[in-house]
Amino acid sequence: MTGVQTCALPISSCRYPRPKSAPAFEPEGQRGDAPLAAARYWGVTQQEYYARADVWPLNPQGELLVIIMCEEVKAIDNLAQILKEVPGIGVVLIGEGDLSQNLGYPRQYDHPAVVEAMTAIRRICLEHDVPCGHPHVEPHNMEKVLTEGYRFLMTAPVRSYAVLDACRKKLGRT
């Protein structure tokens, strides 16, 4: 997501159309109806679903969270404008891998250019009171991430390659 228009699209897509007199009308909802399955999954009536199936923080009762990813220099350059002009963004998640690649330092998360870019994203988010997300929180960096002010934390799933390793061994490709 690199500009105002591309960032407004997911918010519009998550919202049902509302009367123009409704509070927080913009961005206008583009979502189709069909609430039956979703209401059943949520364990609520259709009318309750309509009330809850809106974007937080636009609708304080909304239970949908729109997270945009900031993973290239162009996005950083436009981030302040995006956060000023696009209501409803709940979190800005830094795409560390793609960002480091875009800067020319693939997976070198400690490179000064990558650190500087991530700091700029956090600062802009803080200025606009939008939580900034860190995608790679682990025991060794948890305290640093919290101290730096990240408010949305993600951890990688535990992965096991036992079957792959066994197959490689069986095929002599270890």
Regions found by a protein language model. Name each.
Residues 12-107, 127-129, 136-140, 152-160, ...:
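Conserved alpha/beta-domain cores
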Residues 126, 146:
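Anion (oxyanion) recognition and catalysis
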Residues 2-9:
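Short, small-residue-biased leader/transition segments that mark boundaries at the very start
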Residues 109-118:
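Charged helix-capping and loop-helix junction motifs
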Residues 122, 142:
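Short glycine-/small-residue-rich flexible loop motifs, especially phosphate/cofactor-binding loops
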Residues 1, 134-135:
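Short beta-strand
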Residues 10, 121:
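Aromatic/hydrophobic pocket-lining residues that form π-stacking "cages" and hydrophobic walls in ligand
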Residues 149:
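Conserved functional loop/turn residues at catalytic and ligand-binding sites
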